[in-house]
Every structure is written in C-alpha cells, then in structure tokens.
Amino acid sequence: MTPDHPTSVEIKLEVRDLHVWFDKRHAVRGITLDIADRKTVALIGATGSGRSAVLRALNRLHDLDPAARVEGSVKIDGAEVLGQSTDVPALRRRMGMIFGEPATLPLSVYENVVFGLRAKGVSEQRTLDAACERALRQVMLWDSLQKQLHESALSLPLDWQQRVCIARALAVGPEVLLFDDPSSKLDPVAAQQLDDVIFRLRRDFTILIATNDLHQAARLSDLTFYMIDGEIAESGETLTIFSRPTDSRTEDFLAGRAWS
C-alpha cells in the first residue's frame, strides 16, 4: 500500500514486497512503500507490529542476526540495497540508524562524533574538527559541549548521549536517517527536546521514525504508515491518518483501544 505521489516527486527509497523472518516468525509480510526525498515518514503500530524490523532491513542490520532472513527489494536512489554486491558499510553511512537505547561509545564526546569518519579512513585534523562542530551544531549541542569535547560521553545525561549518537550518524554525511523509538528511554521534557532536533533535520534529510509515541509521529512526519502483524493496514498523509482514518483498526489504535 503506497500513498499517491505526484510524478515530479523524487523517490529516495523504494520498498517492494519486503518480507522479514526470524526463524519461523514472519515479522514483515510483503510491504511496499515509496518514500520521497527529504520527507519524514512515521511507522506506527503496537509492539511486534514489524516497525523496527522494517527499519533494520533498510540498512542491512538483519545481516548481523543469523536467525533473520530478508526477501524483497529495497532501493535507494534506484540502486538495490539487498544485493550481494552492496557495499554494506557505505550503505550504513548513507542511512544512519539511531536506536532507543543510546549507542554511546566509551570514548570522549569528540571521538564518539568522529568515530565513523575515522573508520572511513579520515585522519586530517581540520576535517575531523569541522565535522564534529558541524554535527554537534545540527543536534543543538555545540554551545553546551564545545569545552567538554574531550570528556567522556558516558558522563552526559541520557538525552545528550542520544543527540551525540545522532551527531555521529550526521558526521559521515548521510542522506537518510532511521530512528527506532528514539525517545523510548527519555523523560517527556528530554523527548520534546529530541523532537525539536529531529524537526530541524527534516528539511535536509529523508527520515523514517518507528515510534509508539503518537504525538511524536503526528508532529514530525509528513506520511504515516500504520502496521499490524507485519502488514501496512493504512497509510497516507499524517494529518489525514490522525484526523480521518478510513480503517476502523487505525481509529481504534489512535484512540488507545488497540494497544498490546
């Protein structure tokens, strides 16, 4: 099920008949969707609906799970992602992933942010310094952290650690950002501040957010896909989905009558 797009819209991500299995459990069941360049898409649904499994298929994180099997087609700018010839590290730089639990490294703030660049072979100090400052400005932390760059990132509040992780993804120059329940470990105030960061990033990146925070989905996304048992039950413009859903199951979920 794919929302209609004007033919002039440039499609960044194309997903066709995507299936994901974990051993015998069929977690994603043949979904199809198009995501336009620099649009923000929310994947909503109850726990176990397949939201996170879709995100992890997009940048090949399921490769790390021997129990996982992925079939179908995922393309970024028309190039197949799931093929054997795909440069997976390069793909993951193009599609940065941010998890609910901050993946903070036991390193300084600076080394956390430039970690991906160093892994890519970048060693020129001015390049690293500029990338670190730019990325921390993008997540609205530069003014607060510019004098703490060489202190441990693990000493930061959890919400700042999450933003440092976003900065690490930004430093390598991604085109797509994948957020998997990014606020799930944060208190309401910190979650709102993180939403402010993501809102600022919307104009420059294609963004997918898998979230069970309906306020987050409503505020940040252009399109919303509601998933049930690995399938897309309803999709469309976010304002329409939240105000005038056509599927009674969507209405029940948004009203809090279908949580699991």
Regions found by a protein language model. Name each.
Residues 172, 203:
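Conserved signature/switch motifs of ABC ATPase nucleotide-binding domains
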Residues 235-236:
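ABC ATPase "signature
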Residues 59, 110-119, 129, 150:
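Short helical segment in ABC ATPase nucleotide-binding domains corresponding to the A-loop/adjacent helical element
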Residues 67-69, 80-96, 119, 241-245:
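ABC ATPase NBD coupling module
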Residues 177-180:
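Catalytic Walker B motif of ABC-type/P-loop ATPase nucleotide-binding domains
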Residues 73, 79-80, 126-147:
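Conserved ABC ATPase "signature" region
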